[in-house]
A protein has these predicted regions:
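Compact alpha-helical subdomains of small soluble proteins
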Residues: 35-106
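N-terminal export/targeting and maturation segments
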Residues: 2-41
Length: 106
């Protein structure tokens, strides 16, 4: 089941800044998602977010961005990008964000 995240779709037209660190990425996601969405994400399989949150991450933080910025983002999530793979990076960001949500008790 693909998770529909209304807030993600609403923010697609927002101007976003590609995060340079995990903390910046988490702060943007925290501001964008509702408490209910964060709670559901913390308990779900991350693959369920590939076509919602994952697509938003790819469209706003990866595709069309400067290579140096995307590499910095990948490095923040402990990924070395030799051959660019946007799906893997967006999945890794969601996995780390899910761990963060679990640590803060959601």
């Amino acid at each position: 089941m693909v998770k529909n995240m209304a807030n993600v779709i609403q923010t697609n037209n927002m101007e976003t800044k590609i995060p340079q660190t995990k903390n910046e990425a988490f702060a943007q996601l925290d501001a964008m998602l509702s408490e209910k969405e964060k709670s559901e994400l913390a308990k779900s399989d991350t693959i369920e977010y590939h076509f919602s949150l994952g697509m938003w991450i790819r469209n706003n933080w990866i595709y069309g961005q400067e290579e140096v910025d995307v590499k910095r983002l990948a490095k923040a999530f402990r990924m070395e990008i030799l051959f660019f793979e946007a799906d893997e990076l967006s999945e890794k960001i969601i996995e780390y964000y899910q761990r963060y949500l679990k640590r803060i008790g959601l």
